[in-house]
Amino acid sequence: MGVLKLQTRTVLLLASMALALLLALAFLLASGTAAYAGSTSVFSVKCTSTHQLADDPIVNPGVPGAAHLHEFIGNPTTDANSTFLSMTAAKGSVGCDTQSDTGGYWVPALYKQDGTRVPVLHSFFYYRGPAGVKQIPPDLKMVAGGDTLNPPLPTEHAGSLSWSCVDSGPFFAQPPDCTSIGKPIKAHIQFPNCWDGVNLDSPDHRSHMAYWTSAKTCPASHPVRIPRIRFNVAFNIKNGKGTYLSSDHGVPGGTSLHADFWNTWDQAVLQQAVTKCINGNKDCTRLKDNDPRLQ
């Protein structure tokens, strides 16, 4: 009987340890920031929202007020009349951890049911491998999301669009209620990472780019593999139920989630980050100015 009890206790202990391990792994996969912590072939930048405008220099260039309201993140000069040169000239005044990231990042504004705008809490922009990617071409423009109003069940690694609680899962097609865990809500937008090798933009701002296949290869039509860019944008609200985006016209709240990216970085530093971090298989999360990991 003593041996049987000992065996039973051992089995229960092992089962408990296995369950704890599975829960820990599930949490790490579900966490926007934690999922990337300790990974290699990645660099990231943390930025703050700098201003809001009904402008879109990719979709409506040169036409102020022609778009829905956007949260412009990082570069404080971004507007309808922005150019590559005006964006790069903002170095020294951007709201990012590294002043070399003068890139263009923007997402639709989020509103409460009463019409009050929800501020952006913080944003992380991840650039991931695997190793062997090409440099993101200067002046590349692209839009991700917005055209997929009924996405499949989003996950951390599949599906270009999702909502979650900060540092927690699961992932949803609409903003969730995170009050039970005391966390704000977060939007995730995954950009395509295969370029056609020719066009820096296209009429729909999407066709010159494609997502890689399930085999992690680029289609023949878009053979140039560049870093996978992911926006993780946290909003300062815990209960996202009933919130809606400025782009949600006649669709359920949050399902028009999309984002715009414009490569107006300091190109020399961006090249260093791609070479040293992604292609060098290093973890360069939270890049700073004069970051030793780029040396």
Residue ranges with predicted function:
Residues Y36-A67, E71-I189, D196-Q295:
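Primary mode marks residue(s) on the alpha4-beta5-alpha5 output face of response regulator receiver
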Residues R9-L25:
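Sec-dependent N-terminal signal peptides
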Residues M1-R9:
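N-terminal secretory signal peptides that target proteins for export/translocation
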Residues A24-V42:
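C-terminal region of N-terminal signal peptides and the immediate post-cleavage residues
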